[in-house]
From Swiss-Prot:
Its biological purpose: Required for the fusion of the membranous organelles (MOs) with the plasma membrane, a process essential in spermiogenesis.
One BP annotation, GO: spermatogenesis
Superkingdom field: Eukaryota
Family indicated by similarity: Belongs to the ferlin family.
Identification of the protein by name: Sperm vesicle fusion protein fer-1
Organism: Caenorhabditis elegans
Length: 2034
């Protein structure tokens, strides 16, 4: 049976269980659960077999109840609801990655094995856990699999198997197993299944076994499964989350994916080989969905000669199996061409799976179409087929359209077929699909190209052309190229710097494609409406990114504006979706609409939640706002996506010499024209910059430039009846069409041009006629327009225009009326002057001049005073209330009547040209052509064009070229203000030079080369003067041309290095009221979306028509006359700042050029000032600078610090020969972070008050010394209080800390994160910040982790703005320690949780290694064996010198036997920050000043001394001592900063804080809170408390309490008082152990100042191998004791609790009433022995065997000596398991249970367990005084000799007696008796007083009889079955015998003093054991069988044996006599004869 079929059976099982459980009624189910008693008891036996249920119920409820029952457990296993399963879509599942599969085995339940381990099998690898030998096996062990370079969709198809096995002598035997696909884990929330139970099925199933075997359950296994990437952290491993649920792994559902392949349409002509059409060239489609592949049948193509395309009809249906939810990322359709025996893939189409389904309860299954898929292939770029095939195989986005695949996808029920199937379609779906194909509409697509610049110099001398196509329409290739959809090939022009540009001017080429497409406008419009939100967010995200350097005000304004706009757009989109009525749509359209409506509501909720959670005053508001905007953008982008927008994208190809050199794809939706502007595409009719990418991936990876060129184009796509809107977008330009003719001449042998010329048309075909068809008319005459003619003033038309200005004035009623006309010189024109015209001209009417539109939409320019001409004119383009005059330009057409019509004749026009206007080329007819003749030229040509117009709208001719004619061309001036850069990508080591290159229109310029390429300062203005830009002024203002900026670095070999680029649009200025630009930061972008660095710049575009608008040119740079400075008005406003820099010292310096850095020094540069410190003498002795304070009194910086250059800190090393190499550098860009507005405090001098306080402190200290100390607070000597009691009590685990709440001692704070990340400590950087030095070499882009660090600088930066009369802020330099400080560092390692190892068997033999400076401490000897959650309990003392040894690194290692030890994870602590911080992190402050007991105050200073030191350092007022009289006597108080704290108030706050902390712990543990009448909560405690994750032992305690009670009601104990001793008891205890009132108040004040409390921190362990991933966490705390503070206090003893060694002596005397279960020689008989062991023992102790017991009485007199270790704190027994040689045993705490078993020994079969009893040593029943108390009576031995009844009762003859014996086969004449029956066991009934229980640790010595019980009736014979009227009750227990025992408990010391021998060995005492009173033959199995064997055979076969013996003796005697007498007889015979 396959694994898949096994999984199907398991799924059916859980489906049946789930459905039945849902049907059952609630009361019945509750009653069944309450009444049921668990038959599978929770024992500790190692060899007991599981009991099966005998209940006759068959409902699902009873089944699930039986499966979930655990002995004595109240936990109910419920099926996992799976509501979160498969609710999210998976991204990038097809990309290879390295994955970790984590399997955590927690425990097992209801398993029938003693010793067990779990073997995991995944991907062919097998790993296993350690072996445990407990009735409830617990491992808590992690197993990790690492799968490299594999996509998630392939990983999901693999099977994970968990197999529970029992180790045997020859291997292992399987108990049960669980298998699941990994996709079931992947689809779970966070790709993890946390602490769920899985059901173990019957192992070894095959096809021949019945199905019901699959439903048999073998137990449960609790596991955690997780799949995460190598760069992700594993989930939090919680072994008990309070929800006991069964995760069946059966969430996956099998479906069948139905794919209908109708046809391939619009197959391009290149794919058809005409020769093979006759041979029936065939095509087929291969469909790949995950691991399944299938192919359609081969079909022939049908060629349409008119349309020049082909189609292939398939009409087939493919069925593919699929599991749901799925991880398949896409369905791949490959189109193949069959050529003979070979086959070729000619194109592929991919369908993203995530876009055709939606997960979740409201989602839908995959569906698609019927719709088209566009098939693309990559262009052939090389002649070598091998390389071409390789490049095409790796190409992700093809550049050649192949065809359109018409398909439909649906999901149906599973067809129970594992393989794919193919069927032919019926007629009805074909007809439905054809109806969709026939619903077509004619669409037009236009692309008006205004420029193609930044062309790679590689193509400088090549003819370059642009072709456009949509699908198979347009110029698809060089062979199928049409004039109206391509440009004229031309040689690029040099742009004056580096790149090249196409010679396009006012006659812009336009590509046009007209084709029919299916009507999908409703999809495009809906997507565009939703895409508007994404586009708006993109703009806002770009604005936030380029604001730079923490400009909080600007960021806040942008953020609020973005949120307001987003809120409006969400409302609009919601209303729009509500209005949509899906009329003509398929199933996917309807599903997408419902999905969008649902998601838009969730988006609104998410927006409302996130929008109000941002604090705009936060310093990190930019990062938070950016994260929020990116998150919302991803949601809006997902909303807008629609896979059924199936019209092919616009394909723009850049060709040269017929080869593809670059391409770009433009989705139709971006340029779609709709009736509503909101539904139109973002770039519809707008000019945009399109990056032309390289044709292959090889080029994209290896080329230094990211793009081939940049195309500036205006694109439009819409219906044919919407062409008027396209013309509106083009205005004020016109669309013109031209027919073209070429006259070509060649040179002959004489090197002279031939007289004859060839005439070619636009398609380059020879012709003698003008190609003008019907429906087209020529306009104007012929003109010559060669390739390189950029600006064409005339097009051969005989029309000119007169221009004037119209001025209107506002009347009193607000209307506008005509005022006057003027000419261009402001002279007034009369109306009669406007009507005049010269003779010979035909004039038209005056109208608005759209070309000269500098105003609003109608061309008006407004003014207040009516002055529109001259200097100082103030005009505005928008109408306002105060405007009184307005002006616009008007024009009038004028035609010359003397137009020469002869020039319309082509031949005549040729003759008029002479020998001019030729363009030349060396060889090829296609060029490239140039204007000047060269001696190498062999071809020349003239290009004649003539405008044509279309009279018939239905006619078209692809031979006509289309142009956008801009009659208005103006001069413009671009000014680029390049200021400086920030944190650019380093070019090479030790930096270099950099410059900026700017490309605009047809030109490029660059700045000067400046030094320091990482933070360059250019301060230069780059001007582009008199740039001709064709187009109307308003169009340029609305859509300014794009400016491309590159930052380039200069390498040492004079090559250029790309430092990033960006594109922007300049501020267009055409009037005095236009707003000028402001400097902004522009982030530099790289490929793949990476960024690094920014440039501060500004760009302005001026119109040169009005010279007064253009500001004066800035002054020239010094020594560079051709370079200009930044104008004054653009320079940021500067202010004076006061900068303080506390340069404390350098740390962790790395080697530089293989030499250690010995004498480092630091150089600072901020603004225009520099400072250099003196080198250190020897960094190894003192790394701190002797004079660390650097003060810049006045530094001129920009007022807006976000525009400021960064603070540069360079680290140098002073070496021999005056060398000072640069070791590293650090850039501080975020100067806002270090600005301070706080006025410094003035240190007050109150010497007398400080002296008074010293006297009080001395008096308090003397009082403590005189105090009588109580060394211990322990009430129970057996359970002493220790540090672990405090630790467990602080986590609300009071069952592990008995007596601690009553002691009154304080609790400790448990932090769930590192200490420096808690309570606002901010990594303890309040005094010193850590600035990393980075080596000046080429680094990564955005990832600072990959930058190579050279060291660290400990410093403090403070910037304050200088204001008159106010002193600047100052750094508080008061610190306790200045130079190197000797300290004792005490590291307490508590425990580790969730360690993850890559070991094959998942074993972790962990230990701790510490490193600080040159000190290393290795605790390998104290490793913890095979434990993922080890308890270390280690304390390490290290004497270090801070800061020389400041980094403490704690590493958890994994011990290995042969290989080197493996590092699991490490964490690092900065000791210097903890020593110098104001939060006093040297040692945590205790919760109270405890001076009594085991855990006293452990600080070097008293609270009063600490308070004095803190107030002095923080410049606070001197604390004042107060006192007052109360009812309880004198009460002390302390006044500080005018606030008085009294002792009574402090006590009340302490109590509330303690209760709040415990409530927080209990809430996380799922318990009820304590109540003290106060609702006050401690926020810090709640935030920093540890999540309770170890509740299992507490649950076990409650479970065993119920088990011990045996069904009796538990004693009611007050939980609060039992666990916390809350109330007066604890208050009194606290008052006894606390110090004086002043010390308590001082401690309270210190804790209110947020000083570090006494704590245990949880530090994550990270491993750098294979990515920085978390490998667990470590609980620990560190104390730092400076030596100069005096004596070091005694340390805590945190060593793991040592158990107490005990010896339990059990004397087994007799056994009474043993029920035999076998027969021996027809008699019921038993071979008895007794076995005893304590839970956790690997081997039990047995007595000898009393053989052949007939009366149930066994004599033993045998002593057991059971040694065990007992943990009195947790009341557990320590179990030791050793699975490997040379390895420590594994310790585990188990319940203290003594098991006594009565066994029947079998010689040739397994021994049989008769009965047992489990005695909880803490609470078990006392022995029975007499066997008769339970109905067991001892009987006397019977006489075995029986006389014959016939002989004894009647006198008869011997003959009759013999005859009777012969008949009965009995010599004694006894009648034949029946077989003796088995004795009937006694039903166990509890005697009186049985409820009383005893504790062996209290009683110490016990004697009595204990029953051996069983729940199964021992015999199955009908005559021994219970009768119908027997009242046995529910769940009866039968007594199989009584064992007489004497138990004595001794400690190890007592046992050594009074030893006793095992068995009956000496010394034999307490009690003295004699030899058992049994027959000698009862000691051996063989001897005990001889006598009954003889008796048995004599009884049944004695007469036969006797008769046969007599006969044999007679025969022998006869033969003997004959032998002796034979000679005599023979002699007598002979004599008689003779």
């Amino acid at each position: 049976m396959t694994v898949k079929e096994k999984l199907l059976k398991v799924k059916q099982k859980f489906k049946r269980g789930d459905s039945s459980s849902d049907v059952d009624s609630g009361p019945e189910r509750d009653r069944d659960e309450d009444d049921s008693d668990n038959e599978s008891r929770n024992t500790s036996k190692t060899s007991k077999s599981s009991k099966k249920s005998k209940s006759g119920k068959s409902t699902g409820t009873s089944e699930m109840t039986e499966l979930s029952d655990d002995g004595g457990s109240d936990i109910e296993l419920l099926p996992d609801d799976g509501k979160s399963f498969g609710k999210r879509k998976l991204q990038d599942t097809d990309k290879p990655c390295t994955w970790n599969v984590l399997v955590r085995i927690i425990e097992a339940k209801d398993v029938s094995t003693g010793s067990a381990r779990v073997r995991t099998i995944f991907d062919g690898n097998s790993k296993m856990t350690r072996t445990v030998t407990h009735a409830i096996p617990k491992w808590r062990q992690n197993i990790l699999y690492t799968i490299k370079n594999q996509p998630l969709e392939k990983l999901a198809a693999k099977v994970l198997t968990l197999r529970l096995v029992r180790p045997t002598a020859l291997g292992e035997s399987s108990v049960g197993e669980f298998s699941c696909y990994l996709s079931e884990v992947i689809h779970s929330p966070d790709r993890s299944v946390i602490a769920k139970w899985v059901a173990l099925g019957f192992p070894g199933m095959d096809d021949e076994e019945p199905d019901d075997i699959a439903y048999e359950n073998c137990g449960f296994l609790k596991v955690t499964l997780s799949v995460y990437r190598i760069d992700e952290s594993p989930p939090t491993l919680i072994d008990d989350d309070g929800k006991e649920q069964i995760w069946s792994g059966a969430h996956l559902i099998d479906y069948t994916l139905k794919i209908r392949v109708f046809s391939v349409e619009q197959l391009i002509r290149q794919m058809i080989n005409e020769r093979k059409i006759k041979k029936k060239q065939r095509f087929y489609v291969m469909v790949q969905c995950g691991a399944h592949k299938t192919e359609t049948t081969m079909e022939s193509a049908f060629l349409d000669e008119d349309a020049n395309i082909a189609s292939v009809k398939f009409e087939q249906e493919i069925y593919l199996p699929i599991q749901w939810p799925t991880v398949i990322s896409e369905i791949i359709f490959s189109l193949f061409d069959k050529k003979g025996r070979g086959k070729t893939c000619i194109g592929k189409a991919t369908l993203p799976m995530k876009m055709i389904y939606e997960p979740g309860e409201t989602g839908y299954l995959p569906t698609f179409g019927p719709a088209f898929l566009n098939v693309f292939d990559c262009e052939r770029v090389t002649r070598f087929s091998i390389f071409s095939r390789k490049m095409r195989g790796s190409q992700q986005d093809g550049s050649r359209f192949v065809g359109r695949l018409f398909i439909a996808i649906d999901c149906v029920e599973y067809m129970e077929k594992a393989n794919a199937q193919i069927m032919h379609l019926d007629h009805s779906p074909i007809m439905e699909a054809e109806s969709i194909c026939k619903n077509l509409e004619w669409y037009n697509c236009f692309c008006s190209m205004s420029g193609l610049n930044m062309i790679n110099p590689q193509f400088a001398s090549d003819p370059v052309c642009i072709m456009m196509s949509i699908g198979s329409f347009g110029s698809t290739s060089n062979e199928f190229r049409s004039c109206n959809s391509s440009t004229l090939p031309a040689e690029p022009n040099w742009d004056g710097c580096k790149y090249f540009t196409m010679p396009w001017g006012n006659l812009r080429p336009v590509a046009e494609v007209n084709a029919p497409w299916e009507v999908i406008e409703h999809r495009i419009e809906m997507s565009n409406v939703l895409m508007k939100m994404t586009n708006m967010l993109d703009t806002m995200i770009w604005e936030v990114r380029r604001i730079g350097n923490k400009a909080i005000d600007h960021v806040s304004s942008v953020g609020m504006e973005a949120l307001e706009c987003l809120e409006q757009q969400i409302d609009s989109a919601s209303k729009y979706l509500g209005r949509i009525n899906p009329v003509s749509s398929n199933a996917l359209d309807r599903h997408i609409l419902d999905y969008r409506k649902e998601k838009i509501l969730k988006l609104r909720e998410h927006f409302e939640k996130e929008a109000f959670s941002i604090d705009y005053s936060d310093g990190e508001v930019d990062a938070k706002l950016l994260r929020m905007l990116l998150k919302i953008r991803s949601m809006t982008l997902e909303l807008a996506e629609d896979v059924q927008m199936t019209i092919p994208p616009v394909l723009i190809k850049m060709m040269s010499h017929g080869k593809l050199i670059g391409f770009a794809k433009i989705p139709i939706s971006e340029i779609f024209q709709s009736d509503d502007e909101a539904q139109s595409g973002e770039w519809c009719g707008r000019t945009r910059a399109i990056n032309i990418q390289w044709p292959t991936l090889v080029d994209q990876r290896n080329r230094k430039r990211e793009h081939v060129a940049v195309l500036h184009a205006k694109m439009w796509f819409g219906r044919t009846d919407q062409l008027t809107k396209w013309k509106e977008h083009v205005q004020p330009a016109d669309i013109r069409r031209f027919m073209e003719m070429y006259e070509v001449q060649t040179k002959g042998l004489a090197l002279k041009w031939k007289d004859e010329a060839d005439i070619y048309d636009g398609k380059w075909e020879k012709t003698n006629e003008v190609p003008l068809e019907n429906g087209w008319n020529a306009v104007g005459h012929w003109i010559v327009m060669n390739t390189r003619h950029m600006f064409v003033p005339k097009l051969g038309q005989h029309t000119v225009h007169d221009k004037a200005f119209e001025i209107q004035k506002r009347t009193e009623d607000g209307t506008w009326k005509h005022f006057k006309y003027t000419d261009c010189y402001a002279d007034e024109l009369k109306p009669k002057d406007l009507d005049k015209h010269a003779k010979g001209w035909e004039v038209g009417s005056w109208a608005q001049d759209k070309f000269r539109n500098n105003g609003d939409e109608k061309g008006w320019v407004y003014s207040t005073n009516g002055v529109f001409f001259g200097s100082g004119v103030l005009t505005d383009r928008e109408e306002k209330v105060h405007h009184n005059f307005r002006k616009r330009c008007i024009k009038r057409p004028r035609k010359h009547e003397g137009y020469n019509k002869e020039l319309e004749d082509f031949e005549h026009f040729r003759t008029t040209m002479g020998n001019e206007n030729w363009e030349y080329s060396p060889s090829k007819k296609e060029g490239p052509y140039h204007d000047l003749e060269d001696r190498t030229d062999r071809i020349r040509r003239r290009r004649y064009v003539r405008e044509v117009e279309n009279k018939d709208p239905d006619s078209e001719d692809p031979r006509f070229r289309v142009y956008e004619y801009q009659m208005q061309t103006g001069k413009w001036q671009l000014r680029c203000y390049i200021m400086w850069g920030n944190d650019l990508l380093p070019v090479v080591k030790n930096s270099s030079r950099a410059f900026v290159r700017i490309s605009f229109a047809q030109y490029s310029k660059q700045t000067l080369l400046v030094d320091n390429s990482q933070n360059p300062i250019w301060n230069e203005t780059v001007m582009f003067k008199s740039v001709l830009i064709a187009g109307g002024t308003r169009d340029i203002m609305k859509y300014p041309p794009v400016v491309s900026v590159e930052v380039v670095g200069e390498c040492s070999n004079n090559e250029e290095a790309n430092l990033g680029h960006f594109e922007t649009k300049p501020n267009v200025i055409c009037g005095n009221t236009d707003v000028r630009g402001t400097p902004q930061w522009f982030p530099l972008k790289f490929s793949n979306g990476r960024t690094r660095g920014a440039v501060l710049a500004c760009f302005e575009l001026y119109s040169e028509e009005d010279k007064d608008l253009i500001p004066l040119e800035p002054k020239c740079k010094h020594n560079y006359k051709e370079r200009s400075e930044i104008p004054t008005e653009f320079r940021p406003q500067f202010d004076k700042f006061h900068v303080q820099f506390l340069c404390w010292g350098v740390r962790n310096l790395k080697k530089h050029k293989l030499l250690a850095v010995r004498r480092p020094f630091v150089g600072l540069t901020i603004g225009d000032q520099e400072f250099t410190l003196q080198p250190l003498k020897d960094v190894r002795r003192d790394p701190n600078f002797p004079e660390p304070m650097i003060v810049f009194g006045e530094v001129i910086l920009p007022s807006a610090l976000e525009l400021s250059p960064p603070l540069i800190i360079n680290l140098f090393d002073a070496r021999a020969f005056n060398r000072q190499p640069l070791v590293g550098s650090c850039l501080v860009s975020d100067l806002h972070k270090y600005v301070s507005h706080i006025v410094p405090k003035v240190k007050s001098d109150h010497a007398e008050r400080w002296e008074q306080l010293d006297l009080v402190i001395t008096e308090e200290f003397d009082q403590i010394i005189r105090m009588v100390r109580v060394p211990t607070l322990t009430t129970d000597p057996m359970v002493p209080l220790d540090w672990w009691s405090r630790y467990y009590a602080s986590m609300s685990q009071f069952h592990r800390s008995p007596g601690y709440p009553e002691s009154g001692m304080e609790y400790v704070r448990i932090f769930r994160r590192p200490l420096e990340q808690m309570n606002g400590y901010n990594n303890f950087s309040d005094f010193l910040d850590t600035f990393p030095f980075v080596k000046s070499m080429k680094g990564d882009f955005d990832d600072p982790e990959e930058k190579e660090k050279a060291g660290e600088l400990k410093c403090r930066l403070l910037i304050s703005k200088l204001k008159k009369g106010k002193p600047p802020a100052a750094i508080n330099t008061v610190v306790d320690f200045v130079g190197p400080t000797r300290c004792l560092v005490r590291v307490y390692i508590i425990e580790a949780n969730g360690l993850i190892s890559n070991a094959r068997k998942g074993r972790v033999d962990s230990y701790v290694k510490l490193h600080c400076g040159k000190q290393n401490v290795n605790l390998k000897k104290n490793y913890r064996s095979e434990c993922c959650d080890p308890i270390f309990g280690e304390r390490v003392d290290m004497t270090v010198t801070i800061p020389l040894e400041k980094d403490l690194k704690i590493t958890v290692m994994g011990k290995r036997r042969i290989l080197s030890d493996q590092e699991i994870g490490s964490t690092t602590i900065d000791l210097e920050n903890r020593l110098l911080t104001k939060w006093r992190a040297t040692g945590g402050l205790s919760g109270q000043f405890t001076v009594q007991g085991e855990l006293q105050w452990r600080d070097q200073m008293t609270p009063m001394e600490i308070l004095k030191s803190y107030c002095y350092k923080m410049m606070l007022s001197v604390p004042k001592i107060e006192s007052r009289q109360t009812e309880r006597g004198e009460e002390k108080g302390i006044t500080i900063e005018k606030i008085t704290f009294w002792f009574s108030e402090v006590l009340h706050v302490f109590e509330n804080e303690e209760i709040a902390m415990l409530n927080s712990q209990r809430q996380k543990a799922g318990k009820e809170n304590f109540s003290d009448g106060s609702d006050q909560q401690n926020e810090d405690v709640s935030d920093g408390s540890w999540d309770e994750e170890d509740l299992e032992r507490e649950k076990e305690k409650l479970k065993w309490e119920k088990h011990r009670s045996k069904g009796k009601p538990l004693k009611k104990v007050t939980t609060e008082k039992a666990e916390t001793a809350d109330g007066e008891l604890r208050k009194k205890a606290k008052m006894r152990i606390m110090g004086s009132q002043l010390q308590t108040i001082a401690l309270f004040i210190l804790r209110q100042m947020n000083l570090v409390p006494e704590h245990v921190e949880s530090r994550p362990l990270f491993s750098d191998k294979g990515g920085r991933t978390q490998k667990g966490e470590l609980r620990m705390f560190v104390d730092i004791f400076p030596m100069e503070y005096g004596a070091i206090p005694a340390p805590f003893n945190i060593a793991p609790r040592k158990p107490i060694n005990y010896q339990l002596r059990i004397a087994v005397m007799d056994v009474r009433g043993a029920i035999p279960v076998k027969r021996s020689f027809a008699e019921p008989v038993s071979d008895l022995y007794v076995k005893a062991f304590i839970n956790g023992m690997t081997k039990g102790h047995k007595t000898d065997t009393h053989f052949r017991v007939l009366d149930g009485t066994g004599e033993f007199n045998w002593r057991f000596l059971l040694n065990f270790d007992y943990n009195p704190w947790e009341k557990k027994v320590v179990a030791y398991t050793k699975n490997r040689f040379f390895c420590k045993p594994v310790e585990e705490l188990v319940d203290p249970i003594l098991v006594i078993e009565l066994w029947d020994k079998n010689k040739f079969r397994k021994d049989r367990l008769l009965g047992d009893i489990e005695l909880d040593l803490l609470d078990f029943i006392e022995g029975i005084g007499s066997p008769s108390d339970v109905g067991v009576y001892s009987t006397k031995k019977r006489q075995r000799g029986v006389k014959c009844p016939k002989c004894c009762t009647r006198r008869g003859c011997l003959c009759k007696c013999c005859i009777f014996c012969f008949e009965t086969k009995c010599l004694c004449g006894k009648r034949k008796v029946k077989k003796k029956p088995f004795p009937k066991p006694v039903l166990f009934v509890e005697p009186e007083g049985y409820d009383d229980t005893v504790n062996i640790f209290e009683s110490r010595n016990l004697y009595g009889w204990w029953p051996m019980l069983t729940e199964e009736y021992p015999h199955e014979e009908p005559q021994n079955a219970k009768k119908k009227n027997d009242d046995v009750g529910k769940d009866p227990k039968w007594i199989m015998g009584l064992v007489e025992m004497d138990m004595l408990l001794l400690t190890k010391q007592e046992a050594d003093q009074e030893p006793a021998g095992k068995k009956r060995s000496e010394p034999n005492h307490s009690p003295f054991l004699e030899k058992p009173d049994r027959k000698s033959w009862a000691n051996s199995w063989l001897v005990s069988r001889i006598k009954p064997c003889i008796k048995y055979f004599w009884h049944y076969y004695g007469l036969q044996i006797l008769l046969w013996l007599i006969i044999i003796v007679i025969l022998i005697l006869t033969i003997f006599v004959l032998l002796h007498t034979w000679p005599t007889i023979l002699a007598e015979i002979i004599k008689a004869i003779f």
